[in-house]
From Swiss-Prot:
One of its GO terms (cellular component) is extracellular region. Residues 1-19 form the signal peptide. The presence of a 'disulfide through disulfide knot' structurally defines this protein as a knottin. This is Toxin ICK-17. Keywords: Disulfide bond, Ion channel impairing toxin, Knottin, Neurotoxin, Secreted, Signal, Toxin. It comes from Trittame loki. It comes from the Eukaryota. InterPro entries: Cys_Knot_tox. Belongs to the neurotoxin 21 family.
């Protein structure tokens, strides 16, 4: 019984950490600019349909930005989210 509770607690903690907004690069410095269509660019973690909607990282050599598909446990499927990540990371 104790091991089952430990496994469930670990799984719940993993879901909370992996689903956190900072995992999309929200803490990485980025430029919030007005797009040609008059709207502001979308910050990391926001829904998107194409990469041109997403805000770009200030350091474009180290970081890459764009719209990527990620699993959402809350919505029960894949969603497109703006994301900024380190170019050298295997998660990018």
């Amino acid at each position: 019984m104790k091991s089952i509770v430990s496994i469930l607690l670990f799984c719940a903690l993993a879901v909370v950490i992996m689903g956190h907004r900072l995992n999309q690069g929200y803490g990485i410095p980025h430029d919030v600019v007005k797009l040609p269509n008059g709207q502001w660019c979308k910050t990391p973690g926001d829904d998107c349909s194409q990469s041109s909607e997403c805000c770009k990282a200030k350091d474009t050599v180290t970081y890459s930005s764009g719209c990527s598909q990620q699993w959402s446990g809350q919505q029960g499927g894949f969603v497109n989210l703006c994301r900024i990540c380190n170019v050298e990371s295997s998660m990018c």
